């Protein structure tokens, strides 16, 4: 089970939002590269970056911070990034800069042809981000709820060749209410590619529950507010996941 620390970038700083609201941002660090180093030193095997300004603007907005993070840890672990990725040129620029994966969210829902082209051009580097509330997909930094069913879109995007899916339950993100395990497993069972859970991770109990369903195709979880607020000790959580995985592998 991959525990993936999130570094959400707003105006060059590492922040956390409450339910996607840019006006409810808590600043956790003014040095995102140092934050990246901290998580890697604590045992992170992948990092999840979000360009929040980019997500709302529709184009990259935190390039300096992203490049600083890649300079710091990009040679050591894979780094994935979402937010504001709306063109093949942007994807190419990011991959050339050292990102391992780019996450396409809103653009995938609004312009499936773009996602298909991206998967063809950059095979193995494209992750799709599906944000949903009550099974329906949301777009535009969560501000618009669509009529699309998550599972229908996920299956379509799997056919395009996406590497994996980051699934966020937006009713829970930043609220420390626990991961929506049932919805995540249901999605993972419906597709043959890995699903990364996101939104609401709060404690070791969530880690236990996620490890139990790893065989269903849930390969990782994004760690956000809980590791910044201190509600979850990241290093302890990663150790716990490794121990549980070892036990499951031995079973």
From Swiss-Prot:
Its EC number is 5.3.1.16. Keywords: Amino-acid biosynthesis, Cytoplasm, Histidine biosynthesis, Isomerase. It is found in: Cytoplasm. GO terms for cellular component: cytoplasm. It catalyses: 1-(5-phospho-beta-D-ribosyl)-5-[(5-phospho-beta-D-ribosylamino)methylideneamino]imidazole-4-carboxamide = 5-[(5-phospho-1-deoxy-D-ribulos-1-ylimino)methylamino]-1-(5-phospho-beta-D-ribosyl)imidazole-4-carboxamide. It holds the Pfam family His_biosynth. Gene3D superfamilies: Aldolase class I. The active site is at 8 (proton acceptor), 131 (proton donor). GO terms for molecular function: 1-(5-phosphoribosyl)-5-[(5-phosphoribosylamino)methylideneamino]imidazole-4-carboxamide isomerase activity. It comes from the Bacteria. Belongs to the HisA/HisF family. The keyword Transmembrane does not apply. Pathway: Amino-acid biosynthesis; L-histidine biosynthesis; L-histidine from 5-phospho-alpha-D-ribose 1-diphosphate: step 4/9. Disulfide bonds: none annotated. This is 1-(5-phosphoribosyl)-5-[(5-phosphoribosylamino)methylideneamino] imidazole-4-carboxamide isomerase. One of its GO terms (biological process) is L-histidine biosynthetic process.
